[in-house]
Curated annotation (Swiss-Prot):
Family: Belongs to the LpxK family.
Domain of life: Bacteria
Residues that bind ATP: S47, V48, G49, G50, T51, G52, K53, T54
The organism's taxonomic lineage, starting at the top: Bacteria, Pseudomonadati, Bacteroidota, Flavobacteriia, Flavobacteriales
Keyword Glycosyltransferase: no
Gene Ontology cellular component terms for the protein in this record: plasma membrane
Protein name: Tetraacyldisaccharide 4'-kinase
Chain's gene name: lpxK
Pathway(s) this gene product operates in, as recorded in its UniProt entry: Glycolipid biosynthesis; lipid IV(A) biosynthesis; lipid IV(A) from (3R)-3-hydroxytetradecanoyl-[acyl-carrier-protein] and UDP-N-acetyl-alpha-D-glucosamine: step 6/6
Length: 340
């Protein structure tokens, strides 16, 4: 913890008090939460920064989309539109935000919507001619004006919420006790070979109740990288000199997976809007080499002048074990709460 964060500790106490009072008021029904007559699954985290929400939402889409009419509802962080927007063929990353646009590009049969007001967003989705049967709320763990029926809490293996502090001293949006709302906790970005003993140790550390399930996932990188008109073996590209580009919260694993000693790594803030000056600088740094980026960044850059050099590496969230138990829990919740 750096000195500035230590100095700000009194503000962390104040912020923790404010969020605890807010949660208490929602828990007691003094502040209103709206429920809906269909399965609503909220996915989120206690901390700011990347815990792997996007690949977790994509896992749920793959699980559900062949069985139910699924929809995703996101805030659409840093988008240039306002209010409720339902993705269509005219949508792009500026209208939807990068992550929702990625969902729309990959899963065209799924309704993808954005609205900072999640209550209004769900109401709008339910007013469509084709109504969803289940709604996935992206990054909505603290959005308590909607009472979801099922909560999935994500926490990174190398940054567990049990080891963190409230903002601004740490990165927690609310106190650790907020984890009590979760039906399922997923520890993301684990080592692929994480032992059962270490898994048990983490469960004890997180102090979960008997009714809460815990699962462990790792980042599963694709074996190929993809450009506009071609795909290349990821193993082959590792040996080439290239420019690695990332505008995500925690780019280190991406860089480490692809980097060799001849590569240059270029970072931008999460959800960064690339200016013409940025594009010019990136092109100059690449100097004719391939530019490899994340899938989330690619959706913001694919229509730029970089496209002929630009490639992305897809990732997905893969369970270390007990995947079937996770699937059964989700499907059982939906089955029990689906309107006949």
């Amino acid at each position: 913890m750096n000195l500035l964060r230590k100095i700000l500790f009194p503000f962390a106490i104040l912020y923790g008090l404010i969020t605890s009072i807010r949660n208490f008021l929602f828990d007691k029904g003094i502040l209103k939460s709206t429920s809906f007559d269909l399965p609503v699954i909220a996915v989120g985290n206690l901390s700011v920064g990347g815990t792997g929400k996007t690949p977790q939402i994509e896992y749920l889409i793959r699980l559900l989309s062949n069985k139910y009419r699924a929809a995703t509802l996101s805030r659409g962080y840093k988008r240039k539109s306002e209010g409720f927007v339902l993705a269509d063929e005219n949508s792009n990353a500026e209208i939807l935000g990068d992550e929702p646009f990625q969902f729309y590009q990959k899963f065209p049969d799924v309704q993808v919507a954005v609205d900072a007001n999640r209550t209004n967003g769900i109401t709008q989705l339910l007013s469509q001619n084709v109504k969803p049967q289940v709604i996935l709320l992206d990054d909505a763990y603290q959005h308590r004006k909607v009472k979801a029926g099922f909560y999935i809490l994500l926490t990174s293996y190398d940054d567990l919420y049990a080891d963190d502090f409230m903002l601004p001293t740490g990165n927690l949006r609310e106190s650790r006790s907020g984890a009590n709302r979760a039906n399922i906790v997923v520890v993301t970005k684990c080592p692929k070979n994480l032992s059962e003993e270490k898994q048990a140790e983490i469960r004890l550390k997180l102090k979960l109740s008997c009714s809460q399930q815990i699962f462990f996932t790792y980042i599963d990188y694709d074996v190929e990288i993809y450009g506009k008109d071609e795909k290349i073996s990821a193993a082959e590209i590792k040996s080439e000199s290239k420019l690695l580009l990332a505008g995500i919260a925690k780019p280190k694993p991406f860089f480490e997976y692809l980097k060799n000693e001849n590569d240059e790594c270029l970072t931008f803030p999460d959800h960064h809007h690339f200016s013409d000056a940025d594009l010019e600088s990136i092109q100059n740094k690449a100097n004719g080499r391939k530019i490899i980026t994340t899938e989330k960044d690619y959706v913001r850059l694919k229509d730029s002048k970089l496209v002929s050099q630009l490639y992305y590496l897809p990732i997905k969230s893969t369970f270390i074990n007990h995947q079937q138990n996770f699937d059964v829990s989700i499907l059982q919740y939906i089955k029990e709460n689906l309107e006949p």
